[in-house]
Each structure stands twice: as C-alpha cells, then as structure tokens.
Amino acid sequence: MSAARIALDTARKVSKSRDFWILFGTFFVCGLSTNGLIGTHFIPAAHDHGMNETVAASLLALVGVFDVIGTIFSGWLTDRIDPRKLLFFYYGLRGLSLFLLPSILFSTMHPSTLVFIIFYGLDWVATVPPTIMLCRHVLGVQRATVVYGWVFVGHQVGASVAAIGAAVLRVKLGDYAIAFYISATMCLVAALAVLRIAKGVNAAILRG
C-alpha cells in the first residue's frame, strides 16, 4: 500500500473515534495558543503597551530557549505519568497564564512578564510528548505516526485561525485582550476535554 493510501485509510478509520477528535481538537487549541497567537502576535501586543520591539523580540526568543527544556522534561514525565493528566495541567495552566497576560504587559520588561515568558516557553511544546503517547495508546501503535500526522493538521489549522483571527480582533477592537481571553478559554476547555480520552488501545478502530 502506498504512503498516500495508508494516510487516507488511517484517516478513514480514526475519524470514527471520539478520542481522535478530542486529540485533534486539543491540538488545534495548542497551535492556536502558541504559534498562531503568541508566536505571531506577542511582539505587536507588547508594542501596543509601549514595549520596545527589540525587547519584545528578545522575550519571545527566550520562549524558544525554555521550550527545549520543557519538551525534554515533558518527555521524561510522559514515561511516568498518565499523559491525560499532563495535558490537563499543561492546557489548564496555559489558559490561566493567557488570562493574566493583558495585565502584565508593560513598557519595560517587568518581572511578571518574564515569569510568563519562562512558563510559556516550558509549556510551548510540552503538549507534544503526551499527545504522541495518546496517539499510540488510544489509537494503536501500528500507525501511531500517521495518526499523529493527522492530529498535527489540527495544530496547524489552529495556528492559522489564531494568526488571522487575532489580527482581525486587534483591528476591530484596538487591542489584543479579547484574543488572549478567547484563547485562554479554549485552553481551559481543552484541559477538561483530554480527561475524557479513554484508557487502553482501541484496536477495533484500526481493524475496521
């Protein structure tokens, strides 16, 4: 079977799974709240509050530094803790931090802003190891990489929605506050949604 046929056949099978759509939806929120919102709009949002663009860009660069640490540590945790619980905390804390963000942006680098940057860096790709683990355990090991590929589509769609949507809200409303609050709310919904993912491998889906 060709690679394209395997990908399409896997999509057909996992599309019947509620757990797949939960993973797809929560990864949509992941992309929305990272690359789409913070990655694209943090610098202009900080600039709206009077922060120099170079300072804002430096803070965003720190996200990348702490991202490496957070991802490695999350992989270690995923081998030891229920990945659903990890995702609950990752999305939940991300949502709470986004609710706070509009109130901690200042014209200079405030300590509270730096704390946000460090946390967001640690959390940025921390969702990936437990998501991959759930693709393996819930939907089967045989095509786990293909399943994750389809879940990653949700991530990229979410990123594009936030990149465009936050810009529209900024133009219409004059600031990014509502965009941050919407993203925060979606993160909290994602945190609750992952707890509904079943335990064990749903082998029947991959056979059907």
What name fits each language-model region?
Residues 138-173:
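A late C-terminal transmembrane helix in Major Facilitator Superfamily
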Residues 80-92:
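Cytoplasmic membrane-interface "Motif A"-like loop-to-helix N-cap segments
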Residues 168-185:
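A membrane-interface helix-boundary motif in multi-pass transporters
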Residues 15-74, 162:
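Extracytoplasmic gate region of multi-pass secondary transporters
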Residues 93-106:
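C-terminal ends and interior cores of transmembrane alpha-helices
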Residues 28-29, 112-126:
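Hydrophobic core of transmembrane alpha-helices in multi-pass small-molecule transporters
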